[in-house]
Amino acid sequence: MESYLLDWANLLLRWAHVITAIAWIGSSFYFVFLDSSLTPPEDQDLKQQGVSGELWAVHGGGFYHPVKFAGAPPKLPQNLHWFYWESYTTWLTGFSLFTVSYLWNARTYLIDASVRAWHPHAAIAVAIAFLLVFWVAYDQICRRLGQRKNGDALVGVGVAVLVCIASWLACHWFSGRAAFLLIGAMLATTMTANVAHWIIPGQRKMVASIQAGEPVDPIHGWRGKQRSVHNTYFTLPVLFAMLSNHYSFTYSHPQNWLVLILMMFAGAAIRQFFVLRHGFKLGRNKHPWPYAAVGVVAIPVSYTHLRAHETRHD
Protein backbone atom coordinates (compact mmCIF):
# COMPACT_ATOMS: atom_id res chain seq x y z
CA MET A 1 0.00 0.00 0.00
CA GLU A 2 2.82 2.39 0.89
CA SER A 3 4.61 1.90 -2.42
CA TYR A 4 1.33 2.44 -4.29
CA LEU A 5 0.72 5.74 -2.46
CA LEU A 6 4.32 6.81 -3.04
CA ASP A 7 3.94 6.12 -6.76
CA TRP A 8 0.86 8.33 -6.87
CA ALA A 9 2.60 11.04 -4.86
CA ASN A 10 5.58 10.85 -7.20
CA LEU A 11 3.36 11.14 -10.28
CA LEU A 12 1.24 14.03 -9.01
CA LEU A 13 4.19 15.97 -7.57
CA ARG A 14 6.23 15.48 -10.75
CA TRP A 15 3.30 16.70 -12.84
CA ALA A 16 2.79 19.75 -10.63
CA HIS A 17 6.54 20.44 -10.61
CA VAL A 18 6.76 20.41 -14.40
CA ILE A 19 3.71 22.69 -14.71
CA THR A 20 5.03 25.27 -12.25
CA ALA A 21 8.56 25.08 -13.67
CA ILE A 22 7.25 25.81 -17.17
CA ALA A 23 5.39 28.85 -15.81
CA TRP A 24 8.48 30.12 -13.96
CA ILE A 25 10.98 29.54 -16.75
CA GLY A 26 8.60 30.99 -19.31
CA SER A 27 8.10 34.25 -17.42
CA SER A 28 11.80 34.46 -16.55
CA PHE A 29 12.94 33.96 -20.14
CA TYR A 30 10.37 36.45 -21.37
CA PHE A 31 11.64 39.23 -19.11
CA VAL A 32 15.26 38.51 -20.05
CA PHE A 33 14.20 38.84 -23.68
CA LEU A 34 12.24 42.00 -22.89
CA ASP A 35 15.13 43.69 -21.06
CA SER A 36 17.54 42.75 -23.85
CA SER A 37 15.21 43.99 -26.60
CA LEU A 38 14.11 47.37 -25.24
CA THR A 39 14.90 50.44 -27.34
CA PRO A 40 14.70 54.13 -26.31
CA PRO A 41 11.15 55.47 -26.76
CA GLU A 42 10.42 57.70 -29.72
CA ASP A 43 7.27 59.27 -28.29
CA GLN A 44 7.94 62.47 -26.32
CA ASP A 45 5.09 61.74 -23.90
CA LEU A 46 6.74 58.46 -22.92
CA LYS A 47 10.07 60.20 -22.39
CA GLN A 48 8.43 62.79 -20.15
CA GLN A 49 6.88 59.99 -18.08
CA GLY A 50 10.35 58.58 -17.42
CA VAL A 51 10.17 55.63 -19.82
CA SER A 52 13.66 54.38 -20.69
CA GLY A 53 12.77 51.57 -23.07
CA GLU A 54 9.92 50.16 -25.13
CA LEU A 55 9.16 47.14 -27.24
CA TRP A 56 6.62 46.57 -29.98
CA ALA A 57 5.50 42.98 -30.52
CA VAL A 58 2.77 41.02 -32.24
CA HIS A 59 1.50 37.73 -30.84
CA GLY A 60 -1.68 35.71 -30.96
CA GLY A 61 -3.46 38.15 -33.23
CA GLY A 62 -2.75 41.22 -31.11
CA PHE A 63 -0.19 44.02 -30.85
CA TYR A 64 1.64 44.69 -27.60
CA HIS A 65 3.64 47.69 -26.40
CA PRO A 66 5.37 47.08 -23.04
CA VAL A 67 7.52 49.89 -21.62
CA LYS A 68 10.11 50.09 -18.83
CA PHE A 69 10.61 53.08 -16.56
CA ALA A 70 14.10 54.32 -15.76
CA GLY A 71 13.11 54.77 -12.13
CA ALA A 72 9.66 55.06 -10.64
CA PRO A 73 6.51 55.53 -12.73
CA PRO A 74 4.48 58.70 -12.12
CA LYS A 75 1.73 56.64 -10.51
CA LEU A 76 1.30 53.01 -9.57
CA PRO A 77 -1.74 51.21 -11.02
CA GLN A 78 -4.33 49.63 -8.76
CA ASN A 79 -3.53 46.17 -10.09
CA LEU A 80 0.24 45.61 -10.08
CA HIS A 81 1.19 42.10 -11.19
CA TRP A 82 3.95 40.33 -9.26
CA PHE A 83 5.99 37.32 -10.35
CA TYR A 84 6.94 35.12 -7.42
CA TRP A 85 4.46 32.29 -6.93
CA GLU A 86 5.80 30.63 -10.07
CA SER A 87 9.15 30.35 -8.31
CA TYR A 88 7.81 29.40 -4.89
CA THR A 89 5.50 26.66 -6.14
CA THR A 90 8.26 25.25 -8.34
CA TRP A 91 10.53 24.91 -5.31
CA LEU A 92 7.80 23.56 -3.02
CA THR A 93 6.74 20.88 -5.49
CA GLY A 94 10.37 20.11 -6.34
CA PHE A 95 11.48 19.66 -2.74
CA SER A 96 8.39 17.57 -2.02
CA LEU A 97 9.23 15.38 -5.02
CA PHE A 98 12.86 15.09 -3.86
CA THR A 99 11.61 14.03 -0.43
CA VAL A 100 9.25 11.38 -1.79
CA SER A 101 11.69 10.05 -4.39
CA TYR A 102 15.02 10.18 -2.56
CA LEU A 103 14.86 11.16 1.09
CA TRP A 104 12.01 8.76 1.92
CA ASN A 105 13.99 5.86 0.42
CA ALA A 106 17.48 7.15 1.18
CA ARG A 107 19.00 3.70 1.59
CA THR A 108 17.86 2.74 -1.92
CA TYR A 109 18.16 5.92 -3.97
CA LEU A 110 20.33 8.41 -2.07
CA ILE A 111 23.09 6.10 -0.88
CA ASP A 112 25.49 4.00 -2.94
CA ALA A 113 27.56 1.86 -0.57
CA SER A 114 30.32 1.56 -3.18
CA VAL A 115 30.67 5.35 -3.13
CA ARG A 116 30.12 6.02 0.57
CA ALA A 117 28.46 3.76 3.10
CA TRP A 118 26.73 5.84 5.73
CA HIS A 119 23.58 5.90 7.78
CA PRO A 120 20.46 7.11 5.92
CA HIS A 121 19.83 9.84 8.49
CA ALA A 122 23.34 11.21 7.98
CA ALA A 123 22.95 11.12 4.20
CA ILE A 124 19.61 12.96 4.42
CA ALA A 125 21.10 15.62 6.70
CA VAL A 126 24.06 16.20 4.38
CA ALA A 127 21.79 16.34 1.31
CA ILE A 128 19.66 19.06 2.91
CA ALA A 129 22.82 20.85 4.07
CA PHE A 130 23.96 20.94 0.44
CA LEU A 131 20.96 23.12 -0.41
CA LEU A 132 21.51 25.51 2.48
CA VAL A 133 25.32 25.76 2.54
CA PHE A 134 25.56 26.43 -1.18
CA TRP A 135 23.03 29.26 -0.92
CA VAL A 136 24.93 30.87 1.98
CA ALA A 137 28.29 30.57 0.18
CA TYR A 138 26.83 31.86 -3.10
CA ASP A 139 25.14 34.77 -1.33
CA GLN A 140 28.42 35.76 0.33
CA ILE A 141 30.23 35.68 -3.01
CA CYS A 142 27.61 38.02 -4.49
CA ARG A 143 27.75 40.38 -1.51
CA ARG A 144 31.52 40.56 -1.19
CA LEU A 145 32.57 40.52 -4.84
CA GLY A 146 29.56 41.94 -6.68
CA GLN A 147 30.30 45.61 -6.06
CA ARG A 148 34.04 45.46 -6.73
CA LYS A 149 35.66 46.47 -9.98
CA ASN A 150 34.77 43.81 -12.58
CA GLY A 151 32.38 42.47 -9.96
CA ASP A 152 30.20 40.50 -12.37
CA ALA A 153 33.21 38.59 -13.71
CA LEU A 154 34.54 37.91 -10.20
CA VAL A 155 31.16 36.64 -9.06
CA GLY A 156 30.87 34.47 -12.16
CA VAL A 157 34.25 32.83 -11.54
CA GLY A 158 33.54 32.40 -7.83
CA VAL A 159 30.16 30.79 -8.42
CA ALA A 160 31.56 28.52 -11.15
CA VAL A 161 34.29 27.27 -8.80
CA LEU A 162 31.72 26.74 -6.06
CA VAL A 163 29.49 24.70 -8.38
CA CYS A 164 32.47 22.56 -9.46
CA ILE A 165 33.41 21.83 -5.84
CA ALA A 166 29.82 20.98 -4.95
CA SER A 167 29.52 18.68 -7.99
CA TRP A 168 32.70 16.81 -7.05
CA LEU A 169 31.60 16.38 -3.44
CA ALA A 170 28.09 15.24 -4.35
CA CYS A 171 29.38 12.62 -6.79
CA HIS A 172 31.83 11.30 -4.17
CA TRP A 173 29.27 11.15 -1.36
CA PHE A 174 26.00 10.02 -2.93
CA SER A 175 24.82 7.68 -5.65
CA GLY A 176 25.46 9.13 -9.09
CA ARG A 177 21.78 9.49 -9.85
CA ALA A 178 21.08 11.27 -6.56
CA ALA A 179 24.19 13.44 -6.90
CA PHE A 180 23.09 14.85 -10.25
CA LEU A 181 19.59 15.56 -8.98
CA LEU A 182 20.96 17.07 -5.77
CA ILE A 183 23.11 19.56 -7.69
CA GLY A 184 20.07 20.54 -9.75
CA ALA A 185 18.04 20.97 -6.56
CA MET A 186 20.88 22.97 -5.03
CA LEU A 187 20.93 25.46 -7.90
CA ALA A 188 17.13 25.59 -8.04
CA THR A 189 17.00 26.32 -4.30
CA THR A 190 19.42 29.18 -4.82
CA MET A 191 17.27 30.52 -7.65
CA THR A 192 14.17 30.57 -5.45
CA ALA A 193 16.17 32.01 -2.54
CA ASN A 194 17.24 34.83 -4.85
CA VAL A 195 13.59 35.56 -5.54
CA ALA A 196 12.47 35.26 -1.91
CA HIS A 197 15.37 37.04 -0.18
CA TRP A 198 16.47 39.67 -2.69
CA ILE A 199 14.28 40.24 -5.74
CA ILE A 200 10.82 40.40 -4.13
CA PRO A 201 11.87 42.21 -0.90
CA GLY A 202 13.70 44.79 -3.01
CA GLN A 203 10.64 45.30 -5.18
CA ARG A 204 8.43 45.68 -2.09
CA LYS A 205 10.73 48.42 -0.82
CA MET A 206 10.58 50.15 -4.20
CA VAL A 207 6.78 50.07 -4.19
CA ALA A 208 6.65 51.30 -0.59
CA SER A 209 8.92 54.24 -1.48
CA ILE A 210 6.71 55.21 -4.41
CA GLN A 211 3.56 55.00 -2.29
CA ALA A 212 5.19 57.14 0.39
CA GLY A 213 6.28 59.71 -2.17
CA GLU A 214 9.95 59.03 -1.44
CA PRO A 215 12.77 58.55 -3.97
CA VAL A 216 13.45 54.95 -4.90
CA ASP A 217 16.86 53.61 -3.87
CA PRO A 218 18.42 52.22 -7.10
CA ILE A 219 20.34 49.59 -5.12
CA HIS A 220 17.20 47.44 -4.95
CA GLY A 221 16.88 47.40 -8.72
CA TRP A 222 20.58 46.63 -9.13
CA ARG A 223 20.51 43.72 -6.67
CA GLY A 224 17.32 42.31 -8.13
CA LYS A 225 18.72 42.50 -11.64
CA GLN A 226 21.97 40.80 -10.57
CA ARG A 227 20.17 37.83 -9.00
CA SER A 228 17.68 37.61 -11.87
CA VAL A 229 20.54 37.37 -14.37
CA HIS A 230 22.18 34.63 -12.31
CA ASN A 231 18.91 32.71 -12.30
CA THR A 232 18.68 32.72 -16.08
CA TYR A 233 22.17 31.16 -16.36
CA PHE A 234 21.31 28.51 -13.78
CA THR A 235 18.20 27.42 -15.68
CA LEU A 236 19.64 25.14 -18.39
CA PRO A 237 22.17 23.47 -16.03
CA VAL A 238 19.29 22.72 -13.65
CA LEU A 239 17.20 21.24 -16.47
CA PHE A 240 20.06 18.94 -17.49
CA ALA A 241 20.60 17.80 -13.91
CA MET A 242 16.91 16.97 -13.58
CA LEU A 243 16.62 15.18 -16.94
CA SER A 244 19.84 13.20 -16.43
CA ASN A 245 17.99 10.79 -14.13
CA HIS A 246 16.53 9.17 -17.25
CA TYR A 247 19.99 8.49 -18.74
CA SER A 248 22.13 6.29 -16.54
CA PHE A 249 25.16 6.50 -18.85
CA THR A 250 25.72 10.06 -17.56
CA TYR A 251 25.65 9.56 -13.79
CA SER A 252 27.10 6.00 -13.73
CA HIS A 253 30.42 7.07 -15.26
CA PRO A 254 33.46 6.90 -12.91
CA GLN A 255 34.11 10.60 -13.57
CA ASN A 256 30.43 11.48 -13.44
CA TRP A 257 31.26 14.75 -11.68
CA LEU A 258 33.22 15.85 -14.76
CA VAL A 259 30.36 14.91 -17.08
CA LEU A 260 27.98 16.91 -14.89
CA ILE A 261 30.24 19.97 -14.91
CA LEU A 262 30.77 19.83 -18.68
CA MET A 263 27.07 19.54 -19.44
CA MET A 264 26.12 22.32 -17.03
CA PHE A 265 28.82 24.51 -18.56
CA ALA A 266 27.35 23.75 -21.99
CA GLY A 267 23.92 24.80 -20.75
CA ALA A 268 25.19 28.09 -19.33
CA ALA A 269 27.13 28.89 -22.53
CA ILE A 270 24.13 28.14 -24.73
CA ARG A 271 21.96 30.33 -22.52
CA GLN A 272 24.51 33.14 -22.92
CA PHE A 273 24.19 32.78 -26.68
CA PHE A 274 20.44 33.36 -26.57
CA VAL A 275 20.75 36.27 -24.13
CA LEU A 276 23.30 38.09 -26.31
CA ARG A 277 21.46 37.22 -29.51
CA HIS A 278 18.75 39.73 -28.61
CA GLY A 279 21.33 42.51 -28.37
CA PHE A 280 23.02 41.40 -31.58
CA LYS A 281 19.76 41.78 -33.51
CA LEU A 282 19.67 45.41 -32.34
CA GLY A 283 23.33 46.03 -33.19
CA ARG A 284 24.45 46.31 -29.56
CA ASN A 285 27.04 43.54 -29.55
CA LYS A 286 28.86 41.14 -31.83
CA HIS A 287 27.30 37.88 -32.92
CA PRO A 288 27.41 35.53 -29.90
CA TRP A 289 28.17 32.42 -31.95
CA PRO A 290 31.37 31.69 -29.94
CA TYR A 291 29.22 30.96 -26.87
CA ALA A 292 27.04 28.58 -28.85
CA ALA A 293 30.17 26.94 -30.27
CA VAL A 294 31.69 26.47 -26.82
CA GLY A 295 28.44 25.06 -25.50
CA VAL A 296 28.00 22.71 -28.43
CA VAL A 297 31.65 21.53 -28.24
CA ALA A 298 31.23 20.64 -24.56
CA ILE A 299 28.54 18.13 -25.51
CA PRO A 300 30.66 15.96 -27.88
CA VAL A 301 33.54 16.20 -25.38
CA SER A 302 31.22 14.69 -22.79
CA TYR A 303 30.06 12.07 -25.30
CA THR A 304 33.65 11.14 -26.18
CA HIS A 305 34.54 10.85 -22.51
CA LEU A 306 31.55 8.58 -21.87
CA ARG A 307 32.14 6.52 -25.00
CA ALA A 308 35.80 5.95 -24.15
CA HIS A 309 34.77 4.50 -20.80
CA GLU A 310 32.18 2.19 -22.42
CA THR A 311 34.73 1.00 -25.00
CA ARG A 312 37.26 0.08 -22.30
CA HIS A 313 34.62 -2.06 -20.59
CA ASP A 314 33.24 -3.82 -23.69
Q: For each predicted feature, which ranges?
A:
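Hydrophobic alpha-helical membrane-embedded segments
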Residues: 15-42, 187-202
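Membrane-interfacial entry segments at the cytosolic side of transmembrane helices
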Residues: 148-157, 252-256, 280-296
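Long, contiguous internal "core" modules enriched in hydrophobic/ aromatic residues
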Residues: 103-220
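Alpha-helical transmembrane segments
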Residues: 133-139, 266-276, 300-303
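Cytosolic juxtamembrane amphipathic/interface segments immediately preceding
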Residues: 66-82, 217-221
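Conserved small/polar residues in nucleotide/adenosyl-binding loops
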Residues: 304-311
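Membrane-interface amphipathic/juxtamembrane segments adjacent to transmembrane helices
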Residues: 28-72
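Alpha-helical transmembrane segments and their membrane-interface junctions
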Residues: 91-106, 168-172, 178, 235-252
